[in-house]
UniProtKB/Swiss-Prot annotation:
Residues 37-40, 161-165 are annotated as: Interaction with substrate tRNA. Belongs to the IPP transferase family. It comes from Coxiella burnetii (strain RSA 493 / Nine Mile phase I). This is tRNA dimethylallyltransferase. GO terms for biological process: tRNA modification. Its EC number is 2.5.1.75. Catalyzes the transfer of a dimethylallyl group onto the adenine at position 37 in tRNAs that read codons beginning with uridine, leading to the formation of N6-(dimethylallyl)adenosine (i(6)A). The gene is miaA.
Length: 311
């Protein structure tokens, strides 16, 4: 094994163009791609996760895609073990791992290990407190139960401090507090991480792209994809796979809870909220080089940067 070997991490909010850039980079540099996405691990979750298609996968293979059934609650701890195994395999092949995705908790435990829970910014904290003042902490506890039933079961509906902390973690990271409980034994990996962040400078560009992408997913038979999962009979809305943004809303449409327009509106809104949480975390990421998704010469910019640091 090389001394302090490189790992390149390509991070960014959903719909920022990470997959296209990763494939382009892997065709120009000695990279092998590892997906860092908590939804792409599931077989049958293809259209709604914007998973690389068969043609793209033939051009450039992606590791940690389609590795488990949607009935399996894949965890951050499992990702840590799987990613480490794939990284070592790529090293043996004298290639460089290119980790690509938007599940920030997964990147975090690889690079920094796990010690303390992430802190919330003041805007998030204030928003939760204002909602509690308006609706009461018991109502906030009900909402917590919808996104993190394990934590909600452990927290009294009147325990404002613990409810707020659980909500802060989710709003800041997009991951439930309960997902952190088993991570304390994981240590940062002994590699030199090159962090690249891909995001647009214009937020409206991302919002428009999210809306257009979801509408295209609907045209590409996303409803039928979720219907096949729904009709299996062994899946439910509490599973991590079905709680994935987009799938959760279509599931509620199929169950009759939402009409079509409500489903579409809520799915787009939830995806934008996901992007916001991802950007909140990315802005705090140490030692990262930012690139603008909107730049026409994006690929050459990134290649030049990587070659300039010795890749």
């Amino acid at each position: 094994m090389n001394k302090n070997p490189f790992i390149v991490c390509l991070m960014g909010p959903t719909a920022s163009g990470k997959t296209d850039l990763a494939i382009a980079l892997a065709r120009k540099l000695p990279f092998e791609i590892i997906s860092v996405d908590s939804a792409m691990v599931y077989r049958g979750l293809d259209i709604g996760t914007a998973k690389p298609n068969e043609e793209e996968l033939q051009l450039t293979s992606h590791r940690l895609i389609n590795i488990c059934d949607p009935s399996f609650p894949y965890s951050a701890g499992q990702f840590y073990k799987d990613a480490l195994s794939e990284i070592k395999t790529i090293e043996i092949r004298n290639r460089t791992p290119l980790l690509v995705g938007g599940t920030m908790l997964y990147f975090h435990i690889l690079e920094q290990g796990f010690s303390d829970l992430p802190t919330a910014d003041e805007t998030v904290r204030k928003k939760i407190q204002e909602e509690a003042a308006q609706h009461g902490w018991a109502k906030i506890h009900e909402r917590l139960n919808a996104i993190d039933p394990k934590s909600a079961a452990r927290i009294n509906p009147n325990d404002a401090q613990r409810i707020q902390r659980a909500f802060e973690v989710y709003e800041t990271t997009g991951q439930p507090l309960s997902s952190y409980q088993s991570l304390k034994r994981f240590k940062a990996l002994p590699y030199q991480f090159i962090n690249l962040i891909l995001a647009p400078e214009n937020r409206s560009w991302l919002h428009q792209r999210i809306e257009k992408r979801f509408d295209q997913m609907l045209k590409n038979n996303f409803l039928e994809e979720v219907r096949q999962l729904y009709n299996r009979g062994d899946l439910n809305s509490d599973l991590p796979a079905i709680r994935t943004v987009g799938y959760r809303q279509v599931w509620k449409y199929l169950s009759g809870e939402y009409d079509y327009e409500t489903m579409r509106h809520k799915a787009i809104a939830a995806t934008r909220q996901l992007a916001k949480r991802q950007l909140t975390w990315l802005r705090r990421w140490p030692d990262a080089k930012w690139f603008n998704s909107e730049d026409k010469d994006l690929i050459s910019q990134v290649v030049d940067y990587l070659k300039g640091i010795g890749m």
